[in-house]
């Protein structure tokens, strides 16, 4: 694939999965205090409540739920209002202020000792930041009760937005390309490679769908209201076309945990 200012990019010819040169990127994958408040302020100021509502409908009544990589806890806060029957927990590298009805844990889900299992685990825009995708999905599988569900969301590298960004790079306009393949995204999943990752980790695919983020949530790295409005209008058109063609920017999978005898040690 093309060269990024911060790393080299590669693509698997079999599963179409794109990924960064992981060793070279390891030093970049650090999250400063301004990750939520400055660098991606719009994304976190405009939560995807339409997606939250769709996910909430997929969670069984009375379920215990873990949000893996919960960030500021926006999804869990949504559930406290709309699904008060659920038992809610969240884990993230960053600390969170206490909220009634939510138990927050601070740490790396791959290393933190969690001595219980859950009926549903949700993980939104996290897997693309994890170097060991297989280990992450298997860790989620280990923390789910038999027959429980995992709901994961990530970018869709097969989307129209990604395609235009790659075309722009080859035409000498790399702004969108450099943004989408940023240093914080180690993996770039197509729909095929995302499904494959969950199947390999012990999940059958219940459903999957593509969708767009809220237009107001897009971080557009330009100065000036006119330039911002033009690019945001272009994104709106892309998202509308993506909805019709099935090539929208985000993808979500609902998977059900199935038995994996080779991974039984330490699982629920």
Regions found by a protein language model. Give the residues of each.
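Surface-exposed loop/turn positions
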Residues: 63, 147-148
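S-adenosyl-L-methionine-dependent methyltransferase catalytic module, highlighting the catalytic core
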Residues: 6-7, 131-140, 149-259
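Conserved SAM-binding site of S-adenosyl-L-methionine-dependent methyltransferases, i.e.
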Residues: 127
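Amphipathic alpha-helical interface segments
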Residues: 144
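Conserved N-terminal segment of class I S-adenosyl-L-methionine
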Residues: 1-124, 133-137, 210-211, 219-223, ...
């Amino acid at each position: 694939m093309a060269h990024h200012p911060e790393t080299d990019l590669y693509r698997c010819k079999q599963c179409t999965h794109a990924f960064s040169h992981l060793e070279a990127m390891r030093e970049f994958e650090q999250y400063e205090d301004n990750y939520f408040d400055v660098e991606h302020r719009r994304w976190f100021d405009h939560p995807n409540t339409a997606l939250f509502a769709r996910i909430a409908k997929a969670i069984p009544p009375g379920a215990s739920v873990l949000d893996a990589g919960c960030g500021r806890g926006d999804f869990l806060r949504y559930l406290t209002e709309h699904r008060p029957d659920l038992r809610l927990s969240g884990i993230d590298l960053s600390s969170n202020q206490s909220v009634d009805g939510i138990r927050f844990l601070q740490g790396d889900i791959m290393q933190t000792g969690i001595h219980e299992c859950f009926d549903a685990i949700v993980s939104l825009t996290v897997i693309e930041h994890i170097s060991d995708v297989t280990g992450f999905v298997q860790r989620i599988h280990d923390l789910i009760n038999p027959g429980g569900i995992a709901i994961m969301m990530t970018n869709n590298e097969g989307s129209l937005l990604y395609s235009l960004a790659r075309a722009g790079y080859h035409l000498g306009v790399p702004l969108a390309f450099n943004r989408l393949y940023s240093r914080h995204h180690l993996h770039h999943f197509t729909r095929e490679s995302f499904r494959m990752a969950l199947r390999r980790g012990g999940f059958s695919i219940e459903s999957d769908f593509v969708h767009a983020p809220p237009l107001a949530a897009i971080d557009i790295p330009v100065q000036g209201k006119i330039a911002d409005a033009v690019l945001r209008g272009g994104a709106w058109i892309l998202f509308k076309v993506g909805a019709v063609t099935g090539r929208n920017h985000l993808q979500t999978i609902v998977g059900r945990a199935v038995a994996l005898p080779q991974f039984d040690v330490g699982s629920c």
